[in-house]
Every structure is written in C-alpha cells, then in structure tokens.
C-alpha cells in the first residue's frame, strides 16, 4: 500500500520512507547489534556481494528479507530506536488503517505498546498547560531526538561509503543511476518527516502522544487484543488515575478514547480488570471535575444491565460511590467540585430510571439509586441542602431527577400487590420514594424559613430598582411543586405500602449479607484448603489426608448453616426493634391508630357520595396516622408554604419562572382527588383561608392601574389568567357532577357576586382576546365580501349566495386557470385514436354517414352526444331535450333520466386503465340522458389538450388517452346496482373530491337515498362519472351545465376528428 500514492519526483517502484523504516524496524535475536549499529549493513556480506558482481540492493533484500508469516517474527525483536521516526511519518496512521502487515506486527510487540503508553503518560501531556514544560524534560526530549538522528545519519553515511566503493570497482552507468536514485529517496525521506520550527521543538512529544493515542484507540483488532491480553500494559495505562489532580484534558481524553475502544471490543476483559481494582472509586473521584474521566465511569456503570449483571454496581456500592458523591456536595468543597458531583448523580439517576426504553444506556433501578434514596443518604443530603448556596441548587436538581425518573405509577409490578413469597426482593426492584417524601415533610418548615427570611440586595435595572428573587428561593419553590407531584403517586397514598417496602428492604439486605458471608467463607476455605494441601504434600498416607479433609468440610458446612440461622434471627430482631421504635415516634407508622377499628369513619376509604366530607373532624382523623403522601400535604398546610408562594407570585411581578411554578402548584391542587386523601383540605385552605379568588381580582385591578400609568401590563397577568381559568373549570366540574362540600364556605367563595362578575366580564374578554386570530379581521372580511360580489361566470354575474357557494366558485375559478395553464404547456402533444368507435356531434360539427336531412335539422335545434358501443348499439345524450319531442332514431332507446344531486359524489379514478365490460347491458337498449335546467351548481371545466396517450389494453398499438374516466350508467331497474356500462372516455379534471364532499349540504340524505353505498367510495380526485341511482329527486341540469358540456363536445370534435 505504500506505493499507492507516491511523491512527485519518485518512481513508483521505489520504496516509501515508511517502508524503508519498517525494513529496519526488526532485529534478529541472534545478531545482537548495538543501538548505534542497528541500521548498519554487515561488511562481510557486502564484500561477498561485490565479489559476486551483483547489485548491492539485491543482496540486501536477499540477506535481510523479512518473513511473510507472523509466527516467524518470534525470532525478531523491535527496533525501538526507530519508533520516533515512525511516529513522525505522516503516512503512519493511513498505513495502519490499511492493515500494513509489517506495521501491525511491529506495533503488536509489548515493548512497542509500552513505549506508546509512555508517550500518552508523558509529563508534558499530563500537565494542564503545554508551556509548563521543564528544562529537564526539554533536554530529555532533545537528547532522544539527537540520538535517533545520529543513528540515522550514521546508517546513511555507511550506505554512501558502500555505494562509493561499488562505483570505483564497476564504473558503470547503472551504478551512477542507482546512486542518484538512492540520494533522491533519502532526500524524499527527509522531506516527508514532520519538522517544526526551532521554537516549537518542545511540542514534538505532544504530537507523538496524540499519534500514540490514535494508534492505541484505532479500530484495529490485533493491537486492541494485544493490549487487553497483557494486564501489565493495562495497569500501566490506568496508572494515569493515580496522578495528582488536576489532570490535563488531553491526557484524560486519550485515556477515555483508548479504554472506550477496549471496552467496546472486549467488554468482559476490561470489566474483569476493573473488578480487581480495590480503589477504583477513589481514583476516579480524585478527578471528579474532569469530564472525560467521569463520562467513562458512567459508561462503565451502564454496562451492568438488568438481564446480564457483571458486578460493577455491587463493586461501586461496596466502595461507597454514592455516599462519597453526596459528601462532595458539601459547601466545604469548591463550587466546581459540587457541580461535578451533582451532575454525575443526576446522570446516574437518569440511566437508572424505571422506564428502560427511554434511552439506550438505561440500566433500570439498581442498588446505587436505592442507596441514594435510603433514609441515611436522604438525611445527609437534607443537611447539606439546608446550608444553602450551590449545595441547595445541586440537591434540588438531584431530588427532581429522582422523582421524574422513578414514578411508581409506571412500575410493571405494583409493590403493594406483592409478597415476599410471590416476588422475592432483588437488587433490581423499583425505587421507593417514600423515604424521600417523608424526610422532606419533616423539614418543610426549614425550607419555608429560607423562603421568608432570605434577603438579597436590590438590583438596578432599566425599569428601576427591583428585588431579585434569587436562585435559592426559586429552587425551593420548584422542589415543593415536584414533591407535590410525587405525593399524588398511588403507591405513596397506600396505607400499607410503607410497611411492605421496609419489609422487602430488610429481606433484601439479609440476602445480600448472607451471600457476602458465604462468598467470604468460600474464599477462606479455598485458602485453607490450599494451605492444607501444601502442608500435607509430604505425607505418605493419602487416605488419612482425604478423611481429615472431608471431616473438616462437613464441620465447616455445619458452622456456615448455624451462622446463617443466627444471622436471620438477628435480622428479625432488628426488624422488630425498628417497628417498635417507629410505633413510638412522633410521626407514627401506617395502620397504627385507633381509627382502624372504626371502619365507618375510615378517611382512607374512597367516598361515593356527592358530598365532599371536609369537616374538621375528618381532618383530625387524617392527622392521626397519615400515609406518606398526606404527610407532605399536611406539612404544606401547617407551614403555610403555599400561602408564601402566592404572596411571592404577586410580589415578584416580572419573574415568569416563579409564576409558572406557582401556577403548577395551584393546578395540581384543583385537579387532585376530592374524595380520597388530604388534597380536599388543601383546596379548602386555598379558597377559604388564602382567598385565592380575591387575590386574582386584586391582582387584575392592580394590573389595570399599572397599565394606566405605564402603558403596559404586569408580568404575572398571563399566569394569573391561567389560574383563574383553573378555578372556573373546577366550578364547572362540581356543577356538572352535582358535587357539594360539607364546608359551605367553599361553595360560597366560588359563587360570590364579585367573582361571578369577574369571570363573566373580565375573564371572558381576556379569553376572547387570547383566542383572536392575528391580523386585521375587519379589512379581511370586507375584501372577502367584495370578491364574493364581483364573482362573474360564463352566464353573467351571480347573485349573492351562501359562503359555501362562494368557496365553490373560487375553487372552480382556480381549476379553470390550472386547466388553461395545462393547455398552454401540453399544446401539440395530443393525439387521437382513429379506430375508436365514437362520434362527437354538435350543431356545427360533421354528421355521421348514417344521418339524414331530418336528423340534421333536429341536430341544429337540439344538442346531443352520441357514441357507438363495441356491440354495435348506439347511445345518445341530449343536452337540451325537447319535452314534446317523441321522435326516436331507429334502433335507439330515448329516455328521460333524472340526474340526482348525488352526482357530485360519483367520481371515478381518472388514472385507472379503461376496462369495458362485456355483455353487461342489453345490446338493444340505449340510454339517452336528458339534462334539465334545475341544477343550481354548475361545473366549470376546460378540456385539457395535454393528455399523454398510451396503447389500449384491449387493442395492441391503439392510441388512447392515458388519463380517462367513464360516465357510468346505472340501470333504473337494477335493484342491486351491479349493471354498469362504461361508455365514454374523456379528459381528466383536476378537482379535489374531498373539498366537494365538505361543501355538500345534503350528504346525509344522499347516503340514505343511495342504493349502492360502495359507489360513493369509488370516486377519486381526478375525474367524474355520471351515475344513475334510485334517487327520486327532481333535480336536473341547468343551462350553465349545458353550455359547459357544449364546450367539451366542441373541443373534442375539433381536436379528435379523423
């Protein structure tokens, strides 16, 4: 591959600089050359080649020709002194991706891979700034380059000396040409080397480190496989994590690229190596603010899938990954470290959600997130958040992500419907958020204190001096809104759910501890057995040794069983103690109250009456032993947090983020359950104590006064209107469902006269403005009226009609313009089928040969259309039939058919190929359609002359229009609508059938009167079919339609004549 793209001035047959380097990159183990003589040619072999009168180059190739099989390279070792030259060659990576055999073999040597890792771990790369290279490092780099350059120059000098000797002996012209060729190759080799100015020489190791990282992370199986199989090389690479922080972004990026490649190629091998590291968590957390390293750590965690667990999550749990991350949120650390720890925890929660199909890397609930929501971790996180500052912001983000990604309503198996026997607890059980909600319920007063007492200096803006809300207060409001969402989850409102989850957690912990105990005993027994086997190796009696080992094994097994039983007994005791402590706590557990025996007054039972029981006695029963969801709602009411948030809503008039959060809280309360849970009492408090309706009215009045002085509305008015609409929707709901409250003050607040006046006047006007269409409606309406009045058609000016008539006229005018454009484009493209048995007749057209003078006189007075079927029968359509005329053409049947209004819906597909049924109509029967003057909706059509022709399906070589339609005749005596005669092929019309369906005024009557409903679905948007149904309507065609059809006949007679 090295000769595929050669340099200018070089022969294609000459070797590339990289190929020359690779020829000298291997040293035979038997030769043992020194570092300075690695590239030299043996003088004895040169003398022999001179005596044999052969070319030097051929002798070198024969003597130093490298093997073609990889197994033969075991007798060679790499020439490490050429590695710098290889890395400086610009074609190295290209040749590597092209699978250069010699290059792959050279790079697979452990010595070469170790050297490449040294380049990645170079001190210059590990430092965060390249300019901080010490003089010693600079001298070291220059010294290595100097040694490599001297070796290369010595090799070239020896080569030139040999060439000179050869020239003196031979004096041939071929020798001189060979010398020139070698000199050109040497100069080309020097030119292709990547050289830098003198002041940038210290960047050579940076460039080589980048190339080394690209080689180690390349998609080349031999290199990756050789790296994974050598655990010493992996340990050397991972030693980067042991270096002090901060680690440069270049070094961490190289580390991530290389290990991601190895992880994708051989996941089991890398995971096995990771599981052996005892301090991997500490190594990564030492560089917590290094994004590439933390991203790689998250990817390692995502490899532990629910269906195939590899033990990574258990390893990180043992090494306390989550507690250490929470500790890093403390304000004692700098803000960058806090933010990095918070971001990693949020990313961990994201991939651990209970909806595994949301993202590709999702691993579902696991022990790490379960440890995160445990009571101890929540208590630690709560204490850190109450310190305020950046810790509060990061903590709120973690809590919100936990709630959003672990909604118990989406769990596949609901925990409250399971038992330990039916569903034994596993490490992949859903995450229970009850501990989290319970902890925040107990500390809600502390968060409310931050809301009310936090003071921030005033801020000068273009609108004047304002008081900023502050990020802490906004985050607390956002947290409260999310906790209210969480408290409405079904599992958190089940009285027995808390006890069930605690029991499952205790059982899960017991199983986990027992497994660890058994594993530790197995490992200790294995070591003891190994020691026993070593100590008894010199024993002469083997049978006695086996008996002793079997006895020891049985004794150890009994001890393990006894210890497991004792562990289970201790666990049960611990559970009992925990239950007893919970029963005597300030917030008692569920199902522990006197109201259990009073089934008639159980507030947790859903109410099926129309009266909402919200009396003070019911509220007291709820407070005796509330469930987790109700605990949060009670804390919200007791701390008056919602009242504080509403006051902030009107105080911070321009903070739309706060307005959106407050609206979310109010919306949840009004849309929450009324007959179960404590939500009804929050609603009562919102309407009675807080007086939400009065706050809305006062806020609107304040906005009106502000608008008079500043000519602009206050910033909260948009969300205030939304809150008012929630109140009106709730009022409409209770009226529709005939719901009343036991507390009469609720209904009184909803039906106060001032609130009714506000909703009927102010709120309706606001809603009308919000729903108005943008633009000048009056001007647009006048323009539409003028266009409707000026609409003119073929027969003169039409009188004012309905809106549907106007839209129909506009559609027809557009279709006329489209058809005229098609005529201009398709001029000269139309041909006519000469063999088609059709004749188009008009008052001025040519008569058929069978017509006589009497028929000619009648044709001048009467317009009709006549054609001949394949079976020899004739069919005539009279456009203006004379009601008194009784004369008939011999052999024809002349009947007056009434065309129903259903004609608009009877369209056929113009793009379908024409098929003429055989013997579907009586050969002696001919139908003549008579059009009357009663149809009000005329068609505007213009025949198109741009219809492409195709051969008829029935006659090969016959030209006929490609786009056709048929006027379908339905026999009046056909009860089933199955006899049709497709009689006419004409040009297509570009009408939208869906639009005609929408404009139809009597679609229901048409469907009812239609004999065959399938005919309505047979239509398509490209053509029409005149249909006859059993409809008894008296509507007939008017003069406008007659004139239009006359135009069609005249056009066809002029363009499709023989």
Curated annotation (Swiss-Prot):
Keyword Ubl conjugation set for record: yes
InterPro entries (UniProt xref): SAPS
A single GO cellular-component term on record: nucleus
Annotated Polar residues bias: 42-55, 934-963
GO BP annotations listed: G1/S transition of mitotic cell cycle; positive regulation of potassium ion export across plasma membrane; regulation of signal transduction; tRNA wobble uridine modification
Keyword tags: Cell cycle, Isopeptide bond, Ubl conjugation
Post-translational modifications: Hyperphosphorylated in the absence of SIT4.
Highest taxon of the lineage: Eukaryota
Bias kind Basic and acidic residues: ranges: 135-146, 153-175, 190-202, 838-861, 967-991
Region of interest (Disordered), ranges: 34-71, 135-202, 513-556, 818-862, 873-892, 934-992
A single GO molecular function term of this UniProt record: protein phosphatase binding
Acidic residues bias (residue ranges): 176-189, 528-546, 820-837
Cross-linked sites for Glycyl lysine isopeptide (Lys-Gly) (interchain with G-Cter in ubiquitin): 20
Family note: Belongs to the SAPS family.
UniProt miscellaneous comment: Present with 11200 molecules/cell in log phase SD medium.
Function: Associates with the SIT4 phosphatase in a cell cycle dependent manner. May be directly or indirectly involved in SIT4-dependent functions in budding and in normal G1 cyclin expression.
Name of this protein: SIT4-associating protein SAP185
Organism listed in the record: Saccharomyces cerevisiae (strain ATCC 204508 / S288c) (Baker's yeast)
Phylogenetic lineage: Eukaryota, Fungi, Dikarya, Ascomycota, Saccharomycotina
Chain's gene name: SAP185
């Amino acid at each position: 591959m090295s000769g595929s793209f050669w340099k200018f001035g070089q022969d294609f047959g000459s070797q590339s600089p990289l190929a020359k380097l690779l020829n000298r990159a291997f040293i035979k183990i038997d030769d043992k050359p020194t570092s300075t003589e690695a590239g030299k040619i043996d003088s004895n072999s040169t003398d022999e080649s001179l005596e044999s009168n052969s070319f030097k180059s051929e002798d070198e190739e024969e003597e130093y020709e490298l093997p073609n099989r990889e197994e033969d390279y075991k007798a060679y070792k790499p020439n490490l002194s050429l590695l710098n030259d290889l890395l400086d060659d610009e074609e190295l990576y290209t040749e590597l991706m092209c699978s250069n055999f010699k290059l792959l073999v050279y790079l697979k040597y452990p010595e070469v891979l170790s050297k490449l890792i040294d380049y990645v771990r170079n001190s210059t790369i590990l430092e965060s700034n390249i300019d901080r290279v010490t003089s010693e490092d600079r001298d070291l780099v220059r010294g290595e380059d100097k040694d490599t350059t001297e070796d290369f120059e010595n090799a070239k000098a020896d080569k030139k000396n040999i060439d000179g000797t050869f020239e003196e002996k031979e004096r041939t012209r071929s020798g001189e040409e060979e010398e020139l060729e070698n000199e050109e190759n040497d100069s080309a080799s020097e030119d292709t080397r990547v050289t830098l100015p003198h002041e940038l020489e210290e960047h050579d190791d940076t460039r080589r480190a980048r190339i080394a990282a690209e080689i180690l992370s390349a998609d080349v199986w031999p290199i990756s496989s050789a790296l994974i199989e050598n655990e010493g090389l992996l340990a050397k690479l991972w030693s980067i994590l042991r270096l002090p922080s901060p680690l440069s972004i270049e070094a961490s990026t190289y580390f991530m690229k290389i290990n991601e490649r190895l992880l994708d190629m051989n996941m089991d091998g890398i995971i096995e190596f990771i599981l052996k590291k005892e301090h991997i968590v500490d190594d990564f957390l030492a560089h917590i603010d290094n994004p590439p390293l933390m991203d790689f750590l998250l990817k390692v965690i995502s490899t532990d899938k629910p269906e195939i667990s590899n033990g990574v999550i258990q390893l990180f749990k043992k090494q306390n990954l989550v507690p250490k991350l929470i500790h890093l949120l403390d304000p004692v650390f700098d803000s960058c470290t806090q933010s990095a720890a918070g971001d990693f925890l949020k990313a961990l929660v994201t991939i651990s959600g209970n909806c595994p199909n949301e993202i590709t890397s999702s691993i579902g609930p696991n022990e790490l997130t379960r440890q995160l929501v445990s009571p101890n971790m929540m208590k630690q996180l709560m204490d850190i958040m109450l310190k305020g500052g950046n810790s509060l912001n990061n903590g709120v983000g973690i809590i919100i992500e936990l709630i959003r990604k672990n909604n118990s309503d989406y769990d596949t198996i609901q925990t409250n419907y399971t038992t330990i026997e039916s569903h034994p607890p596993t490490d992949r059980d859903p995450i229970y958020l009850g501990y989290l909600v319970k902890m925040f319920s107990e500390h809600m007063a502390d968060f409310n204190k931050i809301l009310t007492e936090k003071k921030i200096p005033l801020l000068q803006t273009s609108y004047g001096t304002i008081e900023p809300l502050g990020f802490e207060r906004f985050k607390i409001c956002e947290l409260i809104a999310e906790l209210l969402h969480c408290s409405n989850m079904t599992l958190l409102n089940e009285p027995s759910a808390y006890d069930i989850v605690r029991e499952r957690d205790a059982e899960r912990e017991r199983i986990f501890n027992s497994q660890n105990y058994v594993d530790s005993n197995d490992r200790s027994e294995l070591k003891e057995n190994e020691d026993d086997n070593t100590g008894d190796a010199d024993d002469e009696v083997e049978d006695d040794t086996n008996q002793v080992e079997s006895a020891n094994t049985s004794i150890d097994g009994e001890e393990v069983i006894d210890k497991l039983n004792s562990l289970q007994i201790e666990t049960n005791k611990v559970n009992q103690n925990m239950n007893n402590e919970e029963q005597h706590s300030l917030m008692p557990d569920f199902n522990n109250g006197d109201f259990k025996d009073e089934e008639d007054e159980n507030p947790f039972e859903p109410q099926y009456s129309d009266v909402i029981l919200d009396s003070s006695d019911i509220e007291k029963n709820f407070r005796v032993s509330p469930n987790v969801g109700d605990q949060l709602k009670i804390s919200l009411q007791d701390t008056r947090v919602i009242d504080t948030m509403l006051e902030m809503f009107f105080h911070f008039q321009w903070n739309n983020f706060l307005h959106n959060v407050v609206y979310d809280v109010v919306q949840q309360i009004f849309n929450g359950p009324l007959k179960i849970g404590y939500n009804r009492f929050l609603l009562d408090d919102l309407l009675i104590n807080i007086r939400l309706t009065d706050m809305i009215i006062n806020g609107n009045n304040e906005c009106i006064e502000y608008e008079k002085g500043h000519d602009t509305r206050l910033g909260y008015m948009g969300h205030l209107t939304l809150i008012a609409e929630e109140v009106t929707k709730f009022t409409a709901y209770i009226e529709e469902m005939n719901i009343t409250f036991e507390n009469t003050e609720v209904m009184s607040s909803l039906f106060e006269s001032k609130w009714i006046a506000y909703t009927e006047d102010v709120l309706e006007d606001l809603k009308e403005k919000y729903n108005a269409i943008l633009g000048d409606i009056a001007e647009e309406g006048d323009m539409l009226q003028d266009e409707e009045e000026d609409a003119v058609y073929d027969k003169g000016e039409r009188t004012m009609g309905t809106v549907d008539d106007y839209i129909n006229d506009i559609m027809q005018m557009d279709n006329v313009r489209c058809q005229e454009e098609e005529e201009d484009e398709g001029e000269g493209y139309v041909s006519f089928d000469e063999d088609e048995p059709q004749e188009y007749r008009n008052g001025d057209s040519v008569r058929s040969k069978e017509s006589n003078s009497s028929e000619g006189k009648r044709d001048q007075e009467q317009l009709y259309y006549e054609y001949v079927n394949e079976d020899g029968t004739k069919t005539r359509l009279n456009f203006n039939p004379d009601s008194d005329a009784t004369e008939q053409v011999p052999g024809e049947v002349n009947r007056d058919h009434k065309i129903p209004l259903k004609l608009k819906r009877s369209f056929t597909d113009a793009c379908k190929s024409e098929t003429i049924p055989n013997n579907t109509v009586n050969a002696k029967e001919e139908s003549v359609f008579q059009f009357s003057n009663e149809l009000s909706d005329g068609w505007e059509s213009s025949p198109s002359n741009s219809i492409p022709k195709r051969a008829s399906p029935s006659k090969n070589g016959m030209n006929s229009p490609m786009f056709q339609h048929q006027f379908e005749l339905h026999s009046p005596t056909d009860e089933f609508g199955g006899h049709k005669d497709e009689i006419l092929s004409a040009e297509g019309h570009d009408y939208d059938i869906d639009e005609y369906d929408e404009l139809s005024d009597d679609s229901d009557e048409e469907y009812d009167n239609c004999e065959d409903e399938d005919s309505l679905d047979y239509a398509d948007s490209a053509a029409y079919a005149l249909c006859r149904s059993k409809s008894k309507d008296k509507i007939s065609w008017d003069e406008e339609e007659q004139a239009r059809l006359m135009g069609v006949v005249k056009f066809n007679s002029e363009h499709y004549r023989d």
